[in-house]
Amino acid sequence: MYSSNSRRAASILACIVSLTQLGFAQSPFPDCENGPLSKNAVCDTTLDPVTRAQALLAAMTLEEKINNTQYNSPGVPRLGLPAYNWWSEALHGVAGSPGVHFADSGNFSYATSFPSPITLGAAFDDDLVKQIATVIGTEGRAFGNAGHAGLDYWTPNINPYRDPRWGRGQETPGEDPFHTSRYVYHLIDGLQDGIGPEKPKIVATCKHFAGYDIEDWEGNERYAFDAVISDQDMAEYYFPPFKTCTRDAKVDAVMCSYNSVNGIPTCADPWLLQTVLREHWEWEGVGHWVTSDCGAIDNIYKDHKYVADGAHAAAVAVNAGTDLDCGSVYPQFLGSAISQGLLGNRTLDRALTRLYSSLVKLGYFDPAADQPYRSIGWSDVATPDAEQLAHTAAVEGTVLLKNDGTLPLKKNGTVAIVGPYANATTQLQGNYEGTAKYIHTMLSAAAQQGYKVKYAPGTGINSNSTSGFEQALNAAKGSDLVIYFGGIDHEVEAEALDRTSIAWPGNQLDLIQQLSDLKKPLVVVQFGGGQVDDSSLLSNAGVNGLLWAGYPSQAGGAAVFDILTGKTAPAGRLPVTQYPEEYVDQVPMTDMNLRPGPSNPGRTYRWYDKAVIPFGYGMHYTTFDVSWKRKNYGPYNTAAVKAENAVLETFSLQVKNTGKVTSDYVALVFLTTTDAGPKPYPIKTLVGYQRVKAIRPGERKVVDIDVTVGSVARTAANGDLVLYPGSYKLQVDVEKDYPTAGFKIAGKEVVLDHFPQPPRNATKA
């Protein structure tokens, strides 16, 4: 959405200029006490949000309504309705975007910068997700109250991380739809975190609906890409996070995506936006609205060529249920669309009612004294508790991938700090970042740990120059220990930039090999959202340890060194599969199928079993003994099934720390079957997880995992969610020798959720 693509640059620049001209000196809220709107019912707090929004619309002319269907809404000066920019970002903290203005210094010059979602996903800690989201929501409200942002934020990105080449996978918690659904439920609960659903603190926006996970791969650009997706894959993989976000978490906004799905641009698809989203998932609540991705209405006619011109594009989008245009098609062409009879005034009012009733719920039209969130201010931003939470998240999301006993490190001697991330600052934040109060680099953290440091970057992320090798090797030769900090960053993975290779870029592996030849203790710390093939590092005995840290953000250096030195033990798990580099030659990125086929070896851990490092893998500084309290559960009968979200059973594990180091343990519970429902059967499916904190040496803890009926069910070819009778096994963790528990389900197959069938043979509007 927010990229360096020149196609979007003009609108972004114009917005930033307009915000700069405003200077944020005026009040960001309408004057409902003495201004022109004070006599309008929109300011009457005794009325419901829809009635108040409709009163505002009744005072507006058609031209004024149309002007305010765009993201940088100009307001209505004659009514005292201020300009409002709907486009604020907060992926892992309040972030730079057209609607967010960081001051040059002093108040509102920074916000807490948490680890990227892929790093947070590796923690597998739902409570942590909610805590972080609550802080982001509070800081977002503070920025909004001060006129430094809006009150709605276009976050989170919950498209499952299907293909390892995707440039925006870093924005997601990982590849598994169950994990992503759990993540988004707790995230929305924290972000909106209001007194009740009718009084959210901020509005969150689940994006990008639907089937969006290609930027620009071998000439296939997101703006024109048609994602061909089966009903089965749609219901089983691409939809679940959005179903949870809307039906269960009750998010207040959704963003439709650039791409088409099965021939229809998502922002022009009434089946997606009305039949599925609003009707099937019962997301027709007050103030629930849909925005387009930025420029996506343009794409309807310019790239997808679904309709002939801007007027038809605007009409088909509003009619389908896209209420806001992050672009300029609506204000330019809605007047023409209405005059041509392509769009009715009631449909236009429906869109604006949704938008303004959302602002009513946020207290935008309330007197400050009547608004419980208006007191949130600068003192609530970047608090010590928030800073500690950012550090905790970076620690919890770090994953140990290899260790021959070298880790944890001793805190003495001279260490060579090498690699392109060795002194990285904003690189540690990943994308959609905001201005952080500070960023702990690896170099500064090493010095703070008391090491004597020799620093030499050696090479760049994607460099083929060896001019820095000699300095790096000399630093290593003069040190007791070598730590290489590298991986990937925005040079090779970003919005509008997919990878063509999943190997380590540039000559980083060459430098690591030469460092390992020195026979010094060598630890590699890998950064980036996407995985790179670590095969050569895993097989190289000269590489003694390997960590993945993702994008740990402001606390990155301190957090990574806490793990390296053993101040905290690692317990993160990979939230994605690490594929071999040849995987990209076996399946085109444009193939949306999950199941294996003639030109597709399968996607994600559920359908692919030749991983370099599997989904859910993560080592520890200690050892654990894990067992089931019972080996057999049930039997259960489908006749007793009541609802998809009902708990089938609470399965209990016993986890004992049999080593010498206090450590967290992430219990991952996978389901397998070979007879429940039709073939092919997935290799395994994640159905539950829990992060157990601080298990002391010798201590045993009981872990209760609630497994829902819907998690046990499978998706039929037509998209229906079906509970099948049969035999099932539960496996904990990714180690094949861990014990399993079993249960049986008797009875007849039961459809838990009837997938709304899309119209077939879609034609251009």
Swiss-Prot record:
Give the source's domain of life in one word.
Eukaryota
Pathway terms, separated by semicolons: Glycan degradation; xylan degradation
Q: Which GO terms describe its molecular function?
A: alpha-L-arabinofuranosidase activity; xylan 1,4-beta-xylosidase activity
Catalytic activity, as annotated: Hydrolysis of (1->4)-beta-D-xylans, to remove successive D-xylose residues from the non-reducing termini
A Gene Ontology biological process noted in the UniProt record is: arabinan catabolic process
Instruction: Recite the UniProt keywords alphabetically.
Output: Carbohydrate metabolism, Glycoprotein, Glycosidase, Hydrolase, Polysaccharide degradation, Secreted, Signal, Xylan degradation
Q: Does the keyword Secreted apply?
A: yes
| Record-annotated active site | 293
* First and last residue of the signal peptide: 1-25
The record's Gene3D superfamilies line, in alphabetical order, gives: Glycoside hydrolase family 3 C-terminal domain (3.40.50.1700), Glycoside hydrolase, family 3, N-terminal domain (3.20.20.300), Immunoglobulins (2.60.40.10)
Write out the GO cellular component annotations: extracellular region
From the Swiss-Prot or TrEMBL record, state where the protein is found.
Secreted
Q: Which InterPro entries match?
A: BXL, Fn3-like, Glyco_hydro_3_C, Glyco_hydro_3_C_sf, Glyco_hydro_3_N, Glyco_hydro_3_N_sf, Glycoside_hydrolase_SF, Ig-like_fold
Any one Pfam family here would be: Glyco_hydro_3
Residues carrying sugar: 67, 107, 345, 412, 423, 464, 761
What does this protein's UniProt record list under function? Xylan 1,4-beta-xylosidase involved in the hydrolysis of xylan, a major structural heterogeneous polysaccharide found in plant biomass representing the second most abundant polysaccharide in the biosphere, after cellulose.
Protein family: Belongs to the glycosyl hydrolase 3 family.
- Name recorded for this polypeptide: Probable exo-1,4-beta-xylosidase bxlB
Organism expressing this protein natively? Aspergillus terreus (strain NIH 2624 / FGSC A1156)
